[in-house]
Every structure is written in structure tokens, then in C-alpha cells.
């Protein structure tokens, strides 16, 4: 699912980034080849020769969203080194010593600021935040204890385990929405972040720099900051621990060290860390779900990008869901999205062994059906010609045992690798035929109506939205085509539902249509699938950033309260719509004018994508400036004022 890694300049949309798509945190080095006892110092190595041997094949002939060398050169050498050590390029850097990686980084990147001799890993922008100044003032007084009974909360990806993203108690009247004004803005380190979680007076959030923050929800001051050992973009979830545990409440997240992590929610101290899988190209994108003493961790992959490299051994990854004991971090069960283990099936055009089946990544946050004790997930496309039985599927998994109770495949044979759609290029690992990359990127929504009728609502990058029957093994109740879809949606991150309607944001940024599709927001009757209203946004909108990402796409997750729905779009506009009519109630441009952040710096918002609005305690929190797409480099220079900011709105800014 190429959509869940951030993009670069004016690149076509069907691709994951092959370099630096995630920025990892910590000076802790991920596993690489053993270091020689007689390593040659980096300053004695020819970084240019090493680059040509290991990197040029992709970056000198950049395709899709793979950044060109010119784009890479705008980044500090430390960022490039971090990508090879602990980031998305770890598989590509296999066998290189630290000195060789450093030589490549110096040859390609620009000199780092604020370093004395060589590269100071303690000051990597986008790498470890440890030892750097806080991004907002420290709170002057201690917080009250974390109260999971607080009325004002939004805990994790959604307010409830059904993933409806429906805040029933927002402490915000629809009549007051036009009076919302910016109260404070917090500039994240890193290029992306997890959605904010609010519990009482605490706000918890994560970033791809590895920074996990606890802020005051009303003022934005910092209670604590934890430096994780890897990039994280998942939404924190908070839960009580059993008596005798080392903390009363825990904060759970996953990171790109292939691990689930628990922190003491009061202090940020790490309680445990468990590596949940060790497959090649593994990523952690979907947020964790906590329920009944367990956490459920979805596993996704960057295989589509890495497989562009002819010498990369494609493809061994299988998506999975892992259940852990929340108190101890012990793995209770792991369910791959197919029972078939990848096996050798042919040599690619470069003579490398190919494996299959492979694919079925889980990009979404797991959904809980409490009555049936089932976990629902959506899966991604497959990567090879070998059929993958549960690709582009909805799966119902037993919450206690991990057994698969039923599956519904929405699209078969969606076999996809980045760059393969470009004609005239040699691609060693391309499946035949090539699929459209129509993964399920939005978490399934479980909704039980007042009369007991049940629905499982599923949006897909194909532009389709489905209502399945959870009481009848996922049988289709209705389906509706909202757009032609694309590798970046169609429906990407964003669906939400109240008690009568389901709402879907349509991206269409990568649409093959000449007019770049019909981005917008749709409202449908949950029972029938009939369209109640839709809002179409101009694809050729104007933005401060003059690049391919200036588009009217509604890709970011959306959120609903009684009477209003909040949605951000690629053009930087954050809007509230009347749920009955679709009329715009409120519209703020987050990307045109710089705002003063809590650190005192000026920063811009911009492209709105990924994790969506959090609404709690009469305030609305949303991030703007996703992945640097609204900067001059279109997503590669992570420093400066072009995002990535968390904006907190309140009535009259009070």
C-alpha cells in the first residue's frame, strides 16, 4: 500500500518511498552486518564509489516517489545516515559497515549544522530527540494523575473500539464551531506524527523523530518526553494495568524497531519493549488497539518500494496481527494474513530468487466486536504472481486465540510493486499482470443500530465503500462506488460514522483521470448506502506550496461529533461540515500563513494527511504539514518552518 509512507516532490502516487521514508529515533543502531575489527575510517573511504555501487541504480533513475539524488542532497548527511542505520534503508544497507554508510551519507548529503567533527548522532534532525531542547516550555506544575474515567477523552485512533471516530461527548456545541480559533501550535520534530490522544488534562502524541510526548491538553506545555529507539507514527493508547504492575496506567505504541512498547503514562518511563516480528522490510504504521488486557499490534511493510531494486530478494513478507499481554509484553499469539509461507517460485530478471505468496500488510487499526470477541482488520495488496488468499480483504480474527473466523476478499489478484507501471524501464520484480494497489487503508467501522442490526463499514482505495454483515460472516449488505480510486485513494485513511450515516473522504490525488479525479467528502445512509450528500473539492486548488501535492484530496482521517464532521485536505484547509446537509460550517487555512509555535518559532502547516482530528474537552486538535510535502523539496527537507505542527483550536482561542 504505497500510501502509508511519505512522499517526495512532484512524484507519481503509486509508490512508497525507497529512501528515508521513515526517520528513526535514538542513537541505538539497528542490526546491520557485523563490524570488521579493522574498519577503514569514513574519511578514508570513497563515498561516491560506494554510492554508485549501492544506491545509484534507484536514486539516479528515480521513479515514483523514490527521491532523486538531487532531492537527497538537500538533506543533512546525518539524516541519510539515520535512514541507513535505523530507517527504511536498513535492508538496502545490509553488509555495509558504519564507516561505509557514513561515507555514502557525506558524499550525498549536505554538511550537518552544529556538529564539530564528523556526524553527531545526538543531534540528528529526525533521528534521536534525546539531549535536544524540548519543543515547548516545561509545565510549571505537576499534573493530576491520569484519570481513565475523565469525561473529556479521545483514547487512541478512535473514541471507541468500534473505530467509528465518533466523539459523543465533545463538550463543543455545533453553534460554537464558527468561533473556533487557534489556541496553541506545537511543532513536532520529524516528518509525521501519530494522532493525539487526550485523557483529562493530558495530551499524548508521537513522532517519527522517536519523540513521545505528554503535554497539557489546554496549554501545550510539556510534562515529559520519551526518546523511543525508533520512529513512531502510531496513535498512543492508554490503559490501566493490573494490581502489582510497575505502573497504574500504561501508554502503548509501536515503532520501527519492529517492536511494541509500553511506557508509564505518568512519567514516560519504559515498562517493557517486545519485538513482535523480524520479517524483512517490516513497518509499524497502524495504531495499537487495547482491549480486555491485551494489545493488538498490526504489521505492515515497505516491500513495494524495496522490490524496485533488482538485486533485492523479493518477497518474503506476510502481514500479521500480534496479540500481547498488556501488563508484561508477552506475545500471546500471532496471526499471519495467509497460512501459506513464502516459497521460492522463480528467478527474477536479474537472476535473484523470488518468493511468494507475499503481501497482505495490515495498515489499519484493529476494530473490536466485543460481543463476538472478534478483531476485524483490513489488509493490503499482494506483491507477487503467487495468489495471496487474503489480500485486499476484511478478516475476522478470534481475540483470544488468533484463529481466523471468516474473511471477505474485496479484490483478488491485486499484485503490485512500485514503479512497475512506468513503461520503458527495466523492473526485475514486477508481477504480471500488475494490480492497481487498492489496499484497505481505513480501519473497518463496527456499528450496531438501535434495532440491533449490525454493520461493518469498510472503505477501500478503489473508491468503494462496503457494508458487510458481521452476523453473517461478512456477507455484503450494500456497496457504493464513490470514485475511480487510485494507489493513494479513493478512500485512504478516512472514514467515520455516527448513529445514522457513514462518512468517507475521497483523495483521488493519483487518479488517472485527466482532471485528477473528484476529491471530496461523502455522507451515506448506514442502512442502505444511499448518498445523503457530497462535497466536491477542486483538484486544481491553489496552495502556498506549488507542487504536485497541492490538490483538493480528502485523504486524512476524519472525525465526527453530533451535528458536525471535521475533515482536513491536501490544500491545507481544515473544515467542519453540517452532518445533515454537508454545508460548510467553518473553514480555516492551516498552510498559508505562519503561526507562532509554543517554542517561539514560526512554522507553517500545509498538506493534511494521515492521522486525523482529535476532539475532546471542547477543543479540536489536528496536525498539518504532513511529511514535508508542502515544503520546497516536496517532502525531503524536514527542517525549517514547513510543518509538521499540531494545532489546538478552542472557542475564541480561550
Swiss-Prot record:
It is an enzyme of class 1 (oxidoreductase). One of its GO terms (cellular component) is periplasmic space. InterPro entries: Cyt_c-like_dom, Cyt_c-like_dom_sf, PQQ_b-propeller_rpt, PQQ_rpt_dom, Quinoprotein_ADH-like_sf, WD40/YVTN_repeat-like_dom_sf. Its main location: periplasm. Heme c binds at residues 55, 58-59. Belongs to the bacterial PQQ dehydrogenase family. This is Polyvinylalcohol dehydrogenase. It catalyses: a polyvinyl alcohol + 2n Fe(III)-[cytochrome c] = an oxidized polyvinyl alcohol + 2n Fe(II)-[cytochrome c] + 2n H(+). Catalyzes the oxidation of polyvinyl alcohol (PVA) in the polyvinyl alcohol degradation pathway. Residues 1-32 form the signal peptide. Monomer. Residues 42-159 form the Cytochrome c domain. It comes from the Bacteria. Gene3D superfamilies: Quinoprotein alcohol dehydrogenase-like superfamily, YVTN repeat-like/Quinoprotein amine dehydrogenase. Its cofactor is pyrroloquinoline quinone. Its EC number is 1.1.2.6. It is found in: Periplasm. SMART domains: PQQ (SM00564). Optimum temperature is 37 degrees Celsius. SUPFAM superfamilies: Cytochrome c (SSF46626), Quinoprotein alcohol dehydrogenase-like (SSF50998). Optimum pH is 7.2-7.4. GO terms for molecular function: electron transfer activity; heme binding; metal ion binding; polyvinyl alcohol dehydrogenase (cytochrome) activity. Keywords: Heme, Iron, Metal-binding, Oxidoreductase, Periplasm, Signal.
